[in-house]
């Protein structure tokens, strides 16, 4: 990523909230935790921006030391937030204000995202702001350079249950092998981060949260330095939980207490061959996190298996989008709008960026 080093300013401001990133991969029960923690006014975690989807566009901006390029990135990232399925409450961002606030700091798309998060958190008088963009674990090193006080909440879930959930989610692949690989890549990053910075990372298991919500939430609150509140245990009172449950089937269960028996639901959702595939690839992490295996974990996989998996997933994704369009027009339209926004940003960058790398708006005037 292209960054231009400047003297840091806002990082050193003690009145700003502490930044926290939840890691490492979606469908781990992350919304359940976020929605409960949000009952504490000291804590603020809006619907995630998932900047990972913006990252392929970053090279198109060229040298971020160029004010023109960096300001345009600020405008586009703020636009991405506006195009998100769930809007952040009670705040609107002025690109000029955001740009002026961070122009003399290390330049990065992540600095823009976190300026927005920290401003939103400050507006809500929060002491801690958490980004639930779990995929940003892949950018943890840069985030720590930008924010030396950043902490990480590492949420682990049984890979068999998590992959079974990922297989049904339009945000992931529609194949067990491919989703298992995503799971491994994310947890490899998380484990590396934990090994190098153990004091910055708290690891919790989703299954432990299912078994004892109160103890798990108390542990997280202690790590964040905020107070545990009993109302965190009644998510049915969460306005946001009820709001997002109506938007997407992915979130419909978030306005209810989790069902402990669902931890083993993967046994009915996956074939034994799929379970063995997952266990073969993730056995190192399953042992590390204390999950018992059901197979000998000796599944054979080669390049052909991955090619078949890719083809199967592509077909499944196409069918899933068709089904979503028929089943839930709100979810479909909102997701398409965000995807269209990213496509428009890419098209605009490609159209206005001349051979010199400078932006030429007259090209599309």
Model-identified regions with their sequence ranges:
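PAPS-dependent sulfotransferases, especially Golgi type II membrane carbohydrate sulfotransferases
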Residues: 2-21, 226-365
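Short, conserved clusters of charged catalytic residues that mark active-site
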Residues: 17, 28, 112, 135-138, ...
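PAPS-dependent sulfotransferase catalytic domain
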Residues: 21, 101, 117-257
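P-loop (Walker A) phosphate-binding loop of NTP-binding proteins
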Residues: 25
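A conserved segment at the C-terminal end of the G1
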Residues: 30-43
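Active-site micro-motifs of SAM-dependent methyltransferase domains
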Residues: 39, 45, 51, 161, ...
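Short polybasic/polar patches that bind polyanions
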Residues: 39, 222, 287
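PAPS-dependent sulfation machinery
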Residues: 44-131, 136
């Amino acid at each position: 990523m292209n960054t231009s080093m400047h003297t840091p300013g806002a990082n050193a401001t003690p009145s700003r909230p502490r930044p926290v990133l939840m890691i490492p991969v979606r469908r781990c029960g992350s919304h359940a935790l976020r929605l409960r923690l949000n009952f504490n006014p000291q804590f603020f975690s809006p619907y995630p921006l998932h900047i990972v989807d913006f990252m392929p566009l970053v090279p198109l901006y060229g040298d971020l030391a160029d004010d023109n390029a960096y300001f345009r990135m600020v405008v586009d990232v703020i636009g991405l937030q506006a195009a998100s399925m769930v809007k952040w409450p009670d705040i609107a961002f002025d690109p000029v204000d955001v740009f002026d606030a961070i122009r003399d700091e290390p330049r990065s798309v992540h600095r823009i995202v976190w300026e927005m998060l920290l401003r939103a958190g400050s507006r809500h008088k929060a002491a801690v702001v958490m980004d639930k963009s779990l995929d940003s674990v892949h950018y943890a090193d840069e985030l720590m350079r930008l924010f030396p006080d950043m902490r990480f909440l590492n949420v682990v879930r049984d890979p068999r249950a998590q992959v079974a959930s990922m297989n049904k989610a339009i945000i992931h692949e529609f194949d067990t092998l491919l989703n298992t690989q995503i799971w491994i890549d994310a947890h490899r990053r998380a484990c590396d981060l934990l090994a190098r910075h153990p004091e910055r990372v708290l690891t919790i298991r989703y299954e432990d949260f299912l078994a004892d919500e109160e103890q798990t939430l108390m542990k997280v609150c202690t790590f964040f330095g905020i107070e545990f509140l009993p109302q965190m245990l009644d998510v049915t009172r969460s306005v946001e939980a009820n709001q997002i449950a109506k938007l997407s089937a992915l979130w419909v269960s978030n306005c209810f207490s989790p069902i402990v028996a669902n931890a083993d639901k993967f046994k009915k959702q996956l074939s034994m061959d799929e379970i063995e595939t997952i266990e073969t690839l993730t056995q190192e992490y399953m042992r590390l996190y204390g999950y018992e295996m059901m197979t000998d974990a000796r599944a054979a996989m080669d390049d052909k298996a991955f090619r078949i998996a890719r083809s199967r997933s592509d077909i499944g994704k196409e069918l899933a989008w068709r089904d979503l369009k028929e089943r839930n027009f709100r979810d479909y339209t909102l997701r398409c709008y965000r995807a269209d926004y990213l496509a428009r940003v890419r098209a605009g960058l490609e159209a206005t960026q001349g051979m010199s790398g400078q932006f030429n708006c007259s090209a599309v005037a």
